[in-house]
Amino acid sequence: MPITIGNGFLKSEILTNSPRNTKEAWWKVLWEKIKDFFFSTGKAKADRCLHEMLFAERAPTRERLTEIFFELKELACASQRDRFQVHNPHENDATIILRIMDQNEENELLRITQNTDTFSCEVMGNLYFLMKDRPDILKSHPQMTAMIKRRYSEIVDYPLPSTLCLNPAGAPILSVPLDNIEGYLYTELRKGHLDGWKAQEKATYLAAKIQSGIEKTTRILHHANISESTQQNAFLETMAMCGLKQLEIPPPHTHIPIEKMVKEVLLADKTFQAFLVTDPSTSQSMLAEIVEAISDQVFHAIFRIDPQAIQKMAEEQLTTLHVRSEQQSGCLCCFL
């Protein structure tokens, strides 16, 4: 029985996994070949990244593998970063290859191949594991599955969402191009506004995620009557954990949020528009779910931060503060 890994729009099943003793032998040879790519201060973290990739109890998801590759690239000396290469053999988003080349740039030391529904990891030509992705079911439209393909973007030095694939039951797959998301970022770059846009969007997007987590937990614990002050404290403490301050000045009217970019790109596609019209009862909730999923991936590609993890942090923070408040109230009642 295959092991299922991951959540969200993609779940993975292990098809092939090498024995641990074989993995250890390959890892030792790999580490000897690449350890000098890193400064002494980065070697320990690079070693941990490789261990997570190759020895984790559960094989990393597609997204985590991508993160590890780019973390290793960031840790490498500037003179060695050219060895960390992203290759699109078909010049589309059907296949992305992330690879580390040897000193002569002739042989692949590490290769991560990501196809539409499978991804694999090879060490010096030896297959470490092969995983199969299966699209997740849309919560708002249970008769449909969704998958978001990605293509490497030089602007963010990370794969960005490039195609949305929707598969309605008993109907052909609907492919919606998302390339114009990168176009928005390129426009900001060309104007010289990209850094300012990023600083503004990071704070705005995460604040919205934190607020969403607070509201979600408040709804779940509606019987507990969580006070406004507890909710506000949870919001501020989560913002502080993320190194953010509460926004005193709203974004300028020229600022285009990620969610607006994504929505405009989706609705610019006439086929997608027509598809929404065919089922008006669920179209808005489905659109909102898809926009959030794509936006989260765009944000993650730009900032290397998982917005869902931040939202979860806010949920846990509110629960913790509420429980603490209840305990203190109980102690006070006992004292009185």
Curated annotation (Swiss-Prot):
<comment type="similarity">
    <text>Belongs to the Sif family.</text>
</comment>
<keyword id="KW-0472">Membrane</keyword>
<dbReference type="GO" id="GO:0005576">
    <property type="term" value="C:extracellular region"/>
</dbReference>
<dbReference type="GO" id="GO:0016020">
    <property type="term" value="C:membrane"/>
</dbReference>
<dbReference type="GO" id="GO:0141127">
    <property type="term" value="P:symbiont-mediated perturbation of host Rab small GTPase signal transduction"/>
</dbReference>
<dbReference type="GO" id="GO:0030430">
    <property type="term" value="C:host cell cytoplasm"/>
</dbReference>
<keyword id="KW-1043">Host membrane</keyword>
<dbReference type="InterPro" id="IPR044928">
    <property type="entry name" value="SifA_C_sf"/>
</dbReference>
<dbReference type="Pfam" id="PF06767">
    <property type="entry name" value="Sif"/>
</dbReference>
<protein>
    <recommendedName>
        <fullName>Secreted effector protein SifA</fullName>
    </recommendedName>
</protein>
<dbReference type="GO" id="GO:0141028">
    <property type="term" value="P:symbiont-mediated perturbation of host microtubule cytoskeleton"/>
</dbReference>
<dbReference type="GO" id="GO:0044082">
    <property type="term" value="P:symbiont-mediated perturbation of host small GTPase-mediated signal transduction"/>
</dbReference>
<dbReference type="GO" id="GO:0020002">
    <property type="term" value="C:host cell plasma membrane"/>
</dbReference>
<keyword id="KW-1032">Host cell membrane</keyword>
<feature type="region of interest" description="Interaction with host PLEKHM2">
    <location>
        <begin position="1"/>
        <end position="330"/>
    </location>
</feature>
<comment type="function">
    <text>Effector proteins function to alter host cell physiology and promote bacterial survival in host tissues. This protein is required for endosomal tubulation and formation of Salmonella-induced filaments (Sifs), which are filamentous structures containing lysosomal membrane glycoproteins within epithelial cells. Sif formation is concomitant with intracellular bacterial replication.</text>
</comment>
<keyword id="KW-0964">Secreted</keyword>
<keyword id="KW-1035">Host cytoplasm</keyword>
<dbReference type="InterPro" id="IPR010637">
    <property type="entry name" value="Sif"/>
</dbReference>
<comment type="subunit">
    <text>Interacts with host PLEKHM2. Interacts with SseJ; the interaction is indirect.</text>
</comment>
<keyword id="KW-0843">Virulence</keyword>
